[in-house]
Amino acid sequence: RINRDVSIWNVYKRFQETGRFDALSCDWREGMPNKPHVFWDSDVAKWMEAAAFLLEKKPDPQLEAAVDELVDRIADHQDADGYFNTYFTACEPEARFTRRTDHELYCAGHLFEAAVAYAHATGKEKFLGLMRRYADYIERVFKDEQSAAFLTPGHEEIELALVKLYRHTGEKRYLELSRWFVEERGRHEEGLYEMFPSKHAQDHLPVRQMETAEGHCVRAL
């Protein structure tokens, strides 16, 4: 009850104050307050997923309307090719998928999880459809074309999100894309990270050859 009546709305208010929800419009420009951060999309997605979990337990028209408003913002500002990232679209559009350390795939994964949870809780599939378009774009850029500047995420998350997307939709290629991301780890050159060694992101060896826990533990989990 505390989560439903207090926590979810306190976080909502804080995200409004800090500009996280406004950032979904992808219209920030230099000189404006509340410059988006590279992982803000994941913050918003986690809130949306939490709201979905609450809605699954008990309907709440006010909470559902708040999520729907955010979904509409995403729909209005998603790129035609399916890409959606508030930081890169507004701040560095030319740098899309060029820096492994900047959490694009991590943010995408949290958005996928939120979309699955919301569809499961409410039966509404608009958000899910938007994120399936994004997943399809990621599959094309990373697996089919291999045109991104990196091939595996700097921060794991999208792998488990793609499994959830597969379980909900039955679309096996999402499972195969998850497998592809996992099995590509440790198979590419050192020095692809600007700030961290490959061990930091569990990319120093193929997954099945790793015998010790290394790097940033949240990524490893």
Segments (PLM) and residue ranges:
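Glycan-recognition and catalytic cores of secretory/periplasmic carbohydrate-active enzymes
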Residues: 1-221
